[in-house]
A protein has these predicted regions:
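Terminal amphipathic alpha-helical/low-complexity segments used for targeting or macromolecular assembly
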Residues: 1-71, 75
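Structural signal for interior beta-strand "rungs" in well-ordered beta-sheet cores
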Residues: 72-113
Length: 114
């Protein structure tokens, strides 16, 4: 699970690109990279999770929770910063999705809701 991505710009950009490609591959409604980048709340929640998870693992638990709650308000998707999520994760129709503190999600998982 990616915990050191923020400290390495190359790794962070690689993961962002991979996340966008994951959406393009798994969602037939996704047309362009710019659309995915700007208009996919599941992706925004995932990126926020990645950063809050990084903060959580470095002891900034309150900051991580505040970020997590802010993104929940904006996207309707709640991912606890202590959850463990592998690469290739895609949330489709994410409104109301809750991923708790003890959740472990492996690589290349697609989550449908509704």
């Amino acid at each position: 699970m990616e915990t050191d991505i923020i400290g390495n710009r190359t790794s962070l950009l690689r993961i962002i690109r991979a996340d966008i490609e994951t959406v393009l591959q798994r969602d037939p409604a996704a047309r362009t990279r710019i659309e995915v980048l700007l208009a996919y709340p599941g992706l925004h929640a995932l990126w926020s999770y990645r950063f809050s998870h990084f903060l959580w693992n470095r002891g900034s638990k309150l900051t991580a929770r505040i970020l997590s709650n802010t993104i929940r308000f904006l996207t309707g998707i709640e991912i606890h910063p202590a959850a463990r999520i592998g690469t290739g994760f895609f949330i489709d129709h994410g409104m109301g999705v809750v991923i708790g503190e003890t959740a472990i999600i492996g690589k290349n998982v697609t989550l449908y809701h509704g």
